[in-house]
Regions:
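Terminal output helix/cap of sensory domains in signal transduction proteins
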Residues: 34, 38-39, 45-78
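A residue-level detector for well-ordered beta-strand positions
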Residues: 15, 82-83
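Sensory modules in modular signal-transduction proteins
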Residues: 1-33
Length: 105
């Protein structure tokens, strides 16, 4: 089973950024949330799409930020951002996004 299949089966938005804060991957739910296709924004800095993103902070301090309540462009949501470490190398971040509508369902 491929990781993309697993990520797209999850009902929460998933965003993966590299160590430079550029978008590497997001699942279908996150794409619907931001109204973009991955192919159109891959390798662009997340701050171009989400200026208030906390990804740069997690990249800088290499510590997770959990359960941030955000409201951007009329979208209210919770986000948790975690550093990605592989073989003791810091590789970027993974963000989990839950919209208020998803909580109420």
């Amino acid at each position: 089973m491929k990781a993309n299949s697993i990520f797209n089966a999850i009902r929460h938005g998933i965003l993966i950024c590299n160590a430079d804060g550029c978008i590497e991957f997001f699942n279908r739910v996150y794409g619907e949330f931001i109204g973009r296709e991955l192919r159109d924004v891959r390798n662009r800095p997340i701050t171009e799409l989400r200026p208030g993103s906390h990804v740069p902070e997690v990249l800088r301090f290499r510590r997770p930020i959990e359960n941030i309540l955000r409201n951007e462009n009329g979208q209210e949501y919770f986000a948790s951002i975690y550093p990605l470490v592989e073989s003791e190398m810091f590789n970027g971040t993974i963000s989990l996004v839950t919209t208020i509508g998803q909580i109420e369902e």
